[in-house]
């Protein structure tokens, strides 16, 4: 990925699991964003439930949406 397309890495807590594999995540220093699990997380059936700490990658173009890249233990 080029530097222009690189996402912004942030951490947060899952507040709510929505339909269609979407999640409402409260970012530590910011607002609540809408996020989805990355392809590898879906492939390996990693479960994400409300209360989990996660790492997000936010698009520099739309900071209200993101992709969950890691679930903390």
Curated annotation (Swiss-Prot):
Protein biosynthesis in keyword set: yes
Location, primary (coarse class): cytoplasm
Entries under PROSITE patterns matching the protein: S1_IF1_TYPE
InterPro entries noted in UniProt: NA-bd_OB-fold (IPR012340), RNA-binding_domain_S1_IF1 (IPR006196), TIF_IF1 (IPR004368)
Alphabetical list of Gene3D superfamilies matching this protein: Nucleic acid-binding proteins
Every S1-like domain range: 1-73
UniProtKB keywords: Cytoplasm, Initiation factor, Protein biosynthesis, RNA-binding, rRNA-binding
GO MF term set: ribosome binding; rRNA binding; translation initiation factor activity
GO CC entries: cytosol
Cross-referenced Pfam families: eIF-1a (PF01176)
Compartments in which it is found: Cytoplasm
Family, similarity comment: Belongs to the IF-1 family.
PANTHER family linked: TRANSLATION INITIATION FACTOR IF-1, CHLOROPLASTIC
Function: One of the essential components for the initiation of protein synthesis. Stabilizes the binding of IF-2 and IF-3 on the 30S subunit to which N-formylmethionyl-tRNA(fMet) subsequently binds. Helps modulate mRNA selection, yielding the 30S pre-initiation complex (PIC). Upon addition of the 50S ribosomal subunit IF-1, IF-2 and IF-3 are released leaving the mature 70S translation initiation complex.
Quaternary structure (record): Component of the 30S ribosomal translation pre-initiation complex which assembles on the 30S ribosome in the order IF-2 and IF-3, IF-1 and N-formylmethionyl-tRNA(fMet); mRNA recruitment can occur at any time during PIC assembly.
The name this protein goes by in its record: Translation initiation factor IF-1
Source organism of this protein record: Anaeromyxobacter dehalogenans (strain 2CP-C)
Gene label: infA
């Amino acid at each position: 990925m080029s530097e222009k397309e690189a996402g912004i890495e942030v951490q947060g807590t899952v507040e709510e699991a929505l339909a269609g594999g979407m999640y409402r995540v409260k970012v530590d220093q910011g607002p609540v964003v809408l996020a989805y699990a990355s392809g590898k997380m879906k492939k390996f059936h990693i479960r994400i439930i409300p209360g989990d700490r996660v790492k997000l990658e936010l698009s520099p173009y739309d900071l209200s949406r993101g992709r969950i890249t890691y679930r903390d233990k």
